[in-house]
Amino acid sequence: MYKIMTAGPTQVRENVRMARSLECTNPDLDMEFFDFYHETCAMLSKVTNTENKALILGGEGILGLEAACASLTEPGDRVLVIDNGIFGKGFADFVKIYGGQPVLYTADYHNPIAVAELEAFLKTDHDFKYATVVHCDTPSGVCNDVEEISKLLDKYGIMTVADTVAALFGEPLDLSNSKIDILCGGSQKALSVPPGLTMLWVSDRAFEAMANRRTPIASFYANILLFKDYYENKFFPYTMPISDIKGLRVGLENYFADQTIHERHAKIAAATRKALTAGGIKLYLASGWANTVTVLEVPEGVTDRQILRSMEEDYGIMISGCFDVLAGKVVRIGHMGENCYVEQVVPTLQALQGTLEKLGIPVACDLAKTFLTEMGK
């Protein structure tokens, strides 16, 4: 087994693994499970400080992105796709699948969305049913201010769908200070629960838009509206993955018990960037670094596969490459959730330094030592 230091999925704590092995009831029929699910959703609402309805869907985080688009999009709807990263641009595919007309607002992939520049665009064109935006676009590691972006969109009467799969639990997010209508999360990133669950936070306005559609939602599994009154009706649209939800519940308990989780993510991310920069390793981003992942450019003269292979074979540590327009250009270190501890990052930096030097790439400092010095400040 490798030490998993990827940009997600992440390492999983033993108590989460144990919770997923507990005896199961029938989640379709046992009324106690409806209470368990409902209470777990209430914990999710507490994470984001919201009265918006929290839901858990059976499916990896991408399900939430598609479900949001499936449930809101009608044929011909214009949808603003805020694109400053691979996942940001990817929302356009979901919009098109359900008959919408995606309009891309494309910005520099090396920086977060500039709210003032987005507003300048909206002044010229704001006829959109909703907009999509990514909180942390993991391929580049950029972190967008989705709270402020959603408030700007609301000013122009535009609903917001936000993907926080790779940010939430590592980055603070206050839905009460936003106008986000559907927030999409996943289990396998900073919460450090195995992949398999989508979490959604849905506003009344979004539910009203779904209920008042001219055409039926063109999906069953991705139909969020079917979940709206699950507790009152004691009915789920499909059988809930009970073992996954038991693991999620313990993951949430771990999160609430960790009083320094956001501070630690921010500090470890900053120290990681400082060490890499001091070592002469170029970061992909110019600004807007997320607290959950650090993305570095592949040095000239080597390939991403050489770096990844050496990390795995020589040190037993798995980090991430990338795909799409960043394929072969960057590698990524995930320091989120259970990965976000000094004792996890230090051997990762030591392995990276050993790998680069083995491949003939000089490193200007001791990465691990520089990281520890920064952590001690």
Regions found by a protein language model. Give the residues of each.
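PLP-dependent enzyme catalytic core of the Aspartate aminotransferase-like
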Residues: 329-377
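Conserved PLP-dependent catalytic core of the aminotransferase class-I/II
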Residues: 39-47, 252-284, 309-310
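Conserved beta-loop-alpha segment that forms the PLP phosphate-binding cup at the N-terminus of a helix
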Residues: 51-80, 84, 88-92
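Active-site phosphate-binding strand-loop segment of PLP-dependent enzymes
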Residues: 113-164, 169, 182, 190
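Conserved active-site segment immediately N-terminal to the catalytic lysine
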Residues: 176-188
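A glycine-/small-polar-enriched, mobile loop at the entrance of the PLP active site in fold-type I
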Residues: 2-58, 62
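Active-site C-terminal subdomain of aminotransferase-like
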Residues: 11-12, 188-274
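Conserved PLP-binding catalytic core of the aspartate aminotransferase-like
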Residues: 282-314
